[in-house]
Amino acid sequence: MAVAIPNCGTYTVEMDYGASTNAFVLDSVTAGVLDSTDYFLEGTTDWQDVTAYVKQVSINRGRQNRFRDPTGQPSTAVIQIEDRDFRFSLVNEGSPYWNTAKGRLGFELNSGVRISRNGTYLFTGIITQYSQQIENPNRSLVTVNCSDALFTLNNSKTTYFTATPERSDTRIDTVLSNAGAFNKPGQRILETGVANLGNAPVDETASVLEYILRVNNSEQGRVWVDGSGNFNFDRRLVGELQDIDVTLSDTGGTAIPYTTFDIVSN
């Protein structure tokens, strides 16, 4: 259940343990029927609220150096779990999170994770490392390392195609579609770009993220995955170097007031 932290809000940590009651199953008489309205290819994610067992959570997002070009570094989260009854153990078949169909703990690599505050998601991603440290027969400490979906884009290759002349946002949309990434409705939030790209061929040597960063460098915009797990693209700042008139005055009115000023000539 959610945990309220004084003066900070109510936090919830949820993890997907791979169980689904409506996932498509090949050759199944009921769950393997094409065009079924009850069973779906990916199924419905079964999120488990594990907040009560969480000892510590840290989230890291954004560039460490704002003066460098974007590197596509994914946002990360680290969850530490106090596991006194070994329900998060990798070998405990009696765990409520044990996936009987797979014969292993449901929390595994690429399983989903999401962290929210007051109902707003701060982080949505996948497990990239899951480690268990047993300190004594009655205590176990589990560390779950997570990354957002930029991690998966970095591990996916672009498909070969000859791009048509188009804006930067349209090119990013095309590349994501070819990669089958962020395909659910509302998962792509793309501003209309300023840069117009040519019809150069897109090869298969670059990762999807690497190519998107090339497009972003042409735009001088921003790409990131938000707390809800949606892909965002912001176009370049327009008009930031335009002349702006500022009026200072000590007589009131709509001007910016001041008390003293210095004139320095070097």
Predicted regions and their residues:
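Charged, gly/pro-rich, cysteine-poor intrinsically disordered low-complexity regions
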Residues: D262-N266
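Surface-exposed aromatic
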Residues: E191-P201
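Short edge-strand/loop segments of extracellular domains
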Residues: R235-L241
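Short, well-structured beta-strand/strand-turn elements
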Residues: F182-T192, N217-N232
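Assembly/oligomerization scaffold segments
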Residues: M1-E166, T170, T174, N199-Q220, ...
